[in-house]
A protein has these predicted regions:
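Conserved two-metal-ion catalytic palm core of "right-hand" nucleic acid polymerases
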Residues: 163
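Extended amphipathic, helix-rich lipid-handling scaffolds
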Residues: 1-153, 170-242
Length: 243
């Protein structure tokens, strides 16, 4: 608590909620059964983060858990998740939970404005262009497979489509991410707009990105032990590269 407050950033040591609104219903809460409805939760936090509305219904017993009616509204964002049903392991130890709890999750056309979450990721503060995201994933908390992942920045300024596998999520040393296949299209104006709003890029780096013009990439991207590898064909206004 003696640490100085980090203004403009979420600080877990100095949480300050204002304009708190909440409405919830607890129908069951025991070792064998849970039935909770958050009908509305909203607040403003000193970091600048505002939660306009969070709502969901959570039901669970020893065999399965169900999350439904899940919606999040931020000042310029809205996220909706289709009902999730998770099958639980017989033994709820941490290892069994992460490796044996199976579920399916779908997000359809949710809108996210990066500046809404700048309190957690400060570099997004100046990016006000909306992102449309859709995905369908299945798996366990430790191993996920995205059957579809669609990303649309602005008015199709940057578009990405991919199938993604993420393995060993709980073990950073063994974590493995593979996007295969992935297709990425980015317009010159879209890249220039983002680059100009990222504080860690120098003016010269922004000019270099601008000179690339329109970008098209097809192939795969993998990440393991902090090593990022891309294989495929990259086409820009300056030429093409194949690896």
């Amino acid at each position: 608590l003696s640490a100085p407050i980090r203004r403009g950033q979420f600080d877990p040591s100095h949480i300050d909620l204002r304009n708190l609104l909440s409405k919830l219903s607890i129908k069951a809460l025991s070792e064998d059964s849970v039935n909770i409805s958050i009908k509305r939760l909203g607040f403003d936090e000193q970091s600048g983060f505002s939660l306009n509305r969070l709502q969901f219904k959570f039901e669970a017993n020893r065999q399965q858990a169900r999350l439904s009616d899940f919606k999040i509204q931020l000042p310029h964002s809205r996220i909706e998740i289709k009902p999730i049903i998770a099958t639980l392991p017989d033994t709820l130890s941490a290892e069994h939970f992460y490796d044996q709890t199976r579920f399916s999750l779908q997000i359809t056309k949710s809108l996210i404005n990066p500046s809404d979450i700048a309190a957690f990721i400060p570099v997004l503060e100046k990016i006000n262009t909306p992102i449309l995201i859709s995905m369908h994933l299945t798996g366990t908390p430790n191993n996920l497979y995205f059957h579809t992942f669609d990303f649309n920045f602005g008015k199709e300024d940057i578009i990405a489509h991919s199938q993604i596998s993420v393995k060993n999520i709980t073990n950073p040393q063994k974590r493995d991410i593979l996007c295969d296949p992935i297709t990425l299209n980015a317009s010159s104006s879209g890249l220039t707009d983002i680059a100009s709003k990222l504080p860690f890029l120098t003016e010269e780096q922004c000019k270099t990105i601008s000179r690339l013009g329109t970008i098209h990439f097809t192939g795969n991207i993998s990440s393991q032990n902090k090593n990022l590898t891309a294989c495929g064909t990259l086409k820009t206004d300056l030429g093409s590269v194949h690896s």
